[in-house]
From Swiss-Prot:
InterPro entries: HipA_N1. Pfam families: Couple_hipA. This is Uncharacterized protein HI_0666. The lineage of its organism: Bacteria, Pseudomonadati, Pseudomonadota, Gammaproteobacteria, Pasteurellales. NCBIfam families: couple_hipA. It comes from Haemophilus influenzae (strain ATCC 51907 / DSM 11121 / KW20 / Rd).
Amino acid sequence: MRDLVRSGKVFLYGEFIGLLREDHRGFHFSYNPDYQGIPLSLSFPIEQSPFHSDTLFPYFASLVPEGWLKHKYALHQRIDESDMFRFLLNNGENMLGAVQIQEEKQ
C-alpha cells in the first residue's frame, strides 16, 4: 500500500473546476463545489460526489503525449514512461486545448 498522495488542480478555460488526486485507493476526480459551468466531459457530469477509478481516468490519460514525444518527455524530465499521472502533473500547464492541470504541492 502506498502512502503517496499526488494531486493536480484542473482548470477549464482558465477557471478552476476541480481536483484530480491519486492515493493508495486509486484515482479520484471531484468538482470544485463553486463550479457551475459546463462538464469537463460526458464521462464527468457535474455532481458533488467524487468519481473513482483504479487506473487513471481515460479522459485524463488521453491528454498524455504518445509515441516518440512521450519518450522524449520521459528522457528530458527523467520520469517513468508508464507514470501517466506524472506526465500530467509535469506538463499540464502547457497542454493544447482548454484543459490545464497544475500540480498541487503537498
